Amino acid sequence: MKRRLLFLFAVFMVGASVGWGQMIPTYYKVAVGTDGDGSSAGSPIYKTNLETALSDAALSSLDSVIILLPEGVYSANAAPYFITKSSLAIIGEGDTSTVTIKSPVDIGLTNGGNVSFQKVHLTAKTSTGRGVVDIKSSKTTVSF
């Protein structure tokens, strides 16, 4: 009986640890065409522009959001996008010189967390000297 209980406990621990560390993010992919949703976990939700992807990221039920940007030049409304997630990544799918965000984007992470920009070229389009990305949060890690 003791061995069986110990064996069941070991099986439970292994089963719990396998799923414990897996965090399936919400993937958004900006693409030409109509909006659509991912048909399975890990498949992207297609959005027609960066602004729509950022707006929907704030509404995602999952705690991690990844926005994939194909080669091109992107802009979004400077209105704040309040994203209450632990992780937000904006990733360019092309070379850094071919994925550009030109307009100011305000990201509000109300719960802190991590913001990551990968393979994306950020350029300011305003004449006010304002930065391209304004992240309003405390205890936040930002990586480029």
Regions found by a protein language model. Name each.
Residues L8-A16:
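Bacterial N-terminal signal peptides
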Residues S75, S86-D134:
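Right-handed parallel beta-helix/beta-spiral solenoid domain characteristic of secreted/periplasmic
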Residues V18-T52, V73:
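Right-handed parallel beta-helix/beta-solenoid
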Residues A58-D63, I83-T84, L109-N111, K136:
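Flexible, charged surface loops at secondary-structure boundaries
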